[in-house]
Regions:
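Low-complexity, glycine/proline-biased repetitive segments and flexible coils/loops
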Residues: 2-374
Length: 374
């Protein structure tokens, strides 16, 4: 995820172009109503109504929408974590869109919500080659009509397992395992119609690559690289650098940062789970990459990478944006931790597992959030 957008999240790209009605502004001409979602038309007092889809459904507009403009956030499922001092899962892509008044939103518009990818399976014995975590699934919305609009957010890439094959990549790339495979690239989603080039640089879609595994500048056995997030690349592994730390202990790389979208902030959705509200926070951070699994034994607990690319308390299960923390292994073994799951409905990646197979975790499910002025 080496290419990162410098755009503010609020500066989303109107990728369907001008409509000829721009001078009319975004005021709704006449009554506008819509239905659908697990949260159906909540009005938190900021002038917008919101529909939140945490599972498949339909966004239904029963009558002529007039000049209404529909804005949305579509997030793919996060990738699953790798196993045994392995890479963290990459976050799902985030697509932030605003449909013009000419878009064919009248009628029934199908929504699918991508599930998170599964963690890498147990290879049968410690330190044996394993398969990567599974990629997350794509999230889509389709506005039918004579010229349908199809919008897709790709699922995140799975984290590489110990000595396993290189991951194929996804929305944001999954982290490489300990011996330092190359970074896993990000894949921008395709959209139809797509009059403008789609790039990893942001604007319409947000995703980043992972980090290579290991860190040649750090002593000790290498750990995995963090999965990429919508707002930043995954990080390299590193020695903790603490006094009296065992030099053979290496901390897994942190996951890449999530991307903020203030118009979709957690406090606007009081009926969503409290951990979801905390992870998205007052700035609406989604799609954090997952931390990688740590390597080695010693007094550092935990030694897994942090989720979401943020400096949260060590041991926190997720970072801002819902990326899972990586697993840590230390002596005595009862203090070891497994990789943590990506938080559902954030698109966060699943944490990588640590040495001696402390276990990896699944990526978080995606989400679709639609809003319009009322």
């Amino acid at each position: 995820m080496g290419i990162k957008s410098n755009l503010l999240a609020s500066a989303y790209y109107n990728f369907f172009g001008a409509t000829g009605k721009d001078s009319a502004g975004s005021n709704i001409a006449g009554p506008f109503s819509a239905s659908g979602g697990n949260i159906d038309g909540i009005t938190p007092g900021n002038g917008y109504a919101y529909h939140v889809f945490t599972s498949p459904g339909n966004f239904t507009v029963p009558s002529d929408p007039g000049e209404a403009e529909v804005e949305g956030l579509i997030i793919g499922g996060g990738g699953g974590g790798g196993r045994q001092h392995a890479g963290g899962g990459g976050a799902g892509s985030v697509v932030h869109f605003k449909l013009p008044a000419s878009a064919p939103i009248l009628g029934t518009n199908a929504v699918t919500v991508g599930g998170g990818g599964n963690a890498a399976p147990w290879p049968g014995a410690a330190d044996q080659p394993g398969t990567p975590g599974s990629d997350g699934n794509n999230t889509t919305i389709t506005f039918p009509g004579s010229t349908p609009y199809n919008i897709t957010a790709n699922g995140g890439g799975g984290g590489q397992a110990n000595n396993g094959p290189h991951p194929t990549g996804g929305g944001s790339g999954g982290g490489a395992y300990n011996s330092g495979g190359p970074e896993v690239t990000a894949t921008a989603p395709t959209t139809s119609p797509s009059p403008a080039a789609i790039t990893d640089a942001g604007g319409k879609s947000y995703q980043n690559p992972s980090c290579p595994g290991g860190n040649p500048t750090s002593p000790g056995s290498p750990a995995g690289g963090g999965g990429g997030g919508a707002g930043g690349v995954g990080q390299k592994a590193g020695n903790p650098g603490q006094p009296n730390a065992n030099p053979t202990v290496q901390v897994g790389g942190n996951g890449g940062a999530g991307q903020p979208f203030p118009g979709f902030a957690g406090p606007l959705f009081p009926t969503m789970p409290t951990d979801w509200q905390a992870a998205t926070g007052p700035t609406g951070i989604f799609a954090g990459g997952a931390g990688a699994g740590g390597h080695g034994t010693g007094p550092v607990t935990p030694n897994g990478g942090l989720g979401g690319g943020v400096k949260t308390e060590p041991g926190a299960s997720t970072g801002a944006g819902g990326g899972g923390a990586g697993g840590g292994y230390a002596s005595p073994e009862p203090t070891s931790t497994s990789g943590n799951a990506g938080l559902d409905n954030t698109g966060g990646g699943g944490g990588g597992g640590a040495s001696n197979d402390t276990g990896a975790s699944d990526g978080g499910d995606g989400v679709v959030i639609i809003r319009y002025l009322v």
